A protein has these predicted regions:
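Substrate/ligand-engaging "lid" and interaction regions
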Residues: 1-504
């Protein structure tokens, strides 16, 4: 049975379906970057409200700025913008839900003017983003907006025909300002530290280059709430499509699969209204920082620990890595002994319970989360997920063998060869330069840690860290992952550099 509006009434009983009249829903949210995560997260919270008979003015219009977004747009359009959320977990209470919160999907390359008009329409009150780290055109090491990118220069020269997210947002806000229309809130839903601030800095940097008066108006009137978002959402595979079809009879060309867990903590700073998402589990707060640091350092940082060591051992799925007792012990030890001591108190959160939940989520056998997904884009992820913990340890003068092992494992992983002789691609925009540095025969450590856009200045300046990194890398190269894990878990590598030097 093909998924579309006409067939909704024929869905099996166990499949949830929209309980509202989709034709009556206005699109108050424009979401740029419709992928799996948005469809499994923000759209689901909105769907829950719509099913309660609320949020009728907060439907979603999707937007694609890249040519690659056409496949998603055409797929959803062929299904009347319906799709299936297919929860995968190890318990029996997982849900299958047809979602109708997205009511339209615009492609910038088809009609940029139509998109600008949509953004400038007073009905649009929130513009949300999942555009990944690279979409913010911000240098990872300096945090500065990169105005020299060709697409940015194009948008500054052609403000009526933009190509980038900031070109579109700025032109739409300029039109709203000229018409006396309130601005929209810009809400980043990307998995970035201080994501709202990152979006604000990028948009204001662009606007300043275009029109100083417009820059000042945006700075004084547009809200950019920070948010912590969480839901493990693997890439949809043909196996998932077949599994959904077999289980429910639904023929969905692009369902989204996700774990049962989801969480969203948002700063309550919206300049033009918002849905009452708190009624369906969203937590609003004055400051998202402690929640953000907890999630990014414990969940994402531990993912990095599991992923690179697991890949070297030949594991291909997260649950396989967590079934490896030696590796799962290392991951929990990293959480307990390295990350937790550096975290501030998180209001309303029991950290021990939170860590137990993470281990359970990582071990989910049904979701088959791919190690390759977790390993991808390490040059962007590690500076955000692991290096803050390492910097805290360097500043505190404490031993750092586990944190350093994660980075040494990444370096070793970049060779593209696991310990069973299997190969894998390096999925990273910087793959060529990273592999070149990781495969040097001489001065490997100095050159690898000299990648300033990854490690910055402070970390390579720590002689203790450099010596520990060298030791852990040599161990991986000569003894292998298991012996290195055993040594690391059995000892605290000390901060005495002379002692370290004798071990290398």
């Amino acid at each position: 049975m093909k998924l579309n509006t006409q067939n909704l009434s024929q869905l099996p009983e166990r499949v949830q379906r929209p309980l509202y009249d989709r034709k009556q829903v206005q699109q108050g949210i424009v979401h740029i970057g419709v992928g799996g995560f948005h469809r499994a997260h923000q759209a689901i919270y909105t769907e829950m409200l719509l099913n309660r008979g609320k949020a009728g003015e907060w439907g979603i219009c999707g937007v694609g700025l890249r040519s690659e977004d056409r496949a998603m747009q055409e797929t959803l359009a062929s299904q009347d913008y319906l799709y299936t959320l297919y929860e995968l977990g190890d318990s029996d209470n997982t849900q299958i839900q047809v979602v109708g919160a997205i009511g339209d999907f615009l492609l910038a390359e088809d009609d940029s003017e139509a998109l600008i008009r949509k953004l400038a329409d007073p009905q649009t009150r929130i513009v949300s983003l999942t555009i990944t780290e690279g979409g913010y055109c911000t240098d990872d090491s300096s945090g500065q907006f990169n105005a020299d990118l060709p697409q940015i220069r194009h948008d500054l020269a052609n403000p009526q025909q933009p190509k980038t997210v900031f070109g579109f947002l700025t032109e739409a806000l300029a039109r709203r300002r000229a018409a006396g229309v309130k601005p929209f809130t810009v809400m980043s839903c990307d998995n970035l530290p201080h994501n709202g601030q990152v979006a604000r800095n990028a948009l204001l940097s662009f606007a300043r280059l275009r029109d100083l008066g417009l820059h000042d108006w945006i700075a004084g009137n547009v809200s950019f709430p920070n948010a912590m978002v969480d839901r493990i959402t693997p890439m949809t595979s043909d196996a998932h499509r077949s599994q959904l079809l077999e289980e429910t009879g639904i023929e969905d060309a692009w369902p989204v699969v996700a774990e049962p867990f989801l969480q969203w903590v948002v700063e309550d700073r919206f300049c033009n209204g918002r849905p009452s998402w708190e009624e369906v589990g969203v937590q609003f707060t004055d400051d998202v920082t402690p929640y953000e640091e907890m999630k990014i350092r414990l969940l994402n940082g531990s993912h990095m620990a599991m992923a690179y060591l697991g890949a070297l051992l030949g594991h291909r799925y997260a649950h396989e890595a967590m079934q490896d007792a030696q590796l799962s012990e290392f991951v929990r030890s990293y959480m307990d002994r390295d990350v937790t001591p550096l975290l501030a108190e998180v209001p309303g959160i029991d950290l021990e319970h939170y860590k137990d939940t993470l281990i359970e989520r990582f071990s989910n056998t049904a979701i088959c989360d791919q190690i390759s997904r977790l390993c991808s884009d390490g040059s962007s992820k590690l500076p955000k997920f692991v290096l803050p913990t390492l910097l805290g340890q360097i500043e505190s003068g404490v031993a750092m063998p586990r944190t350093t092992l994660i980075l040494a494992a990444w370096c070793h992983y970049l060779r593209g060869l696991d310990e069973q002789g299997g190969t894998y691609p390096i999925l990273d925009p910087r793959a060529a330069s990273l592999q070149e540095a990781a495969c040097l025969k001489e001065r490997l450590v100095e050159n690898f840690l000299g990648l300033e856009d990854v490690f910055g200045h402070k970390i390579p300046a720590s002689a203790t860290f450099v010596a520990t990194f060298r030791l852990q890398l040599v161990r991986l190269q000569t003894l292998g992952v298991r012996a290195t894990l055993e040594l690391t878990m059995a000892e605290e590598v000390g901060t005495d550099e002379r002692k370290l030097a004798t071990l290398i």
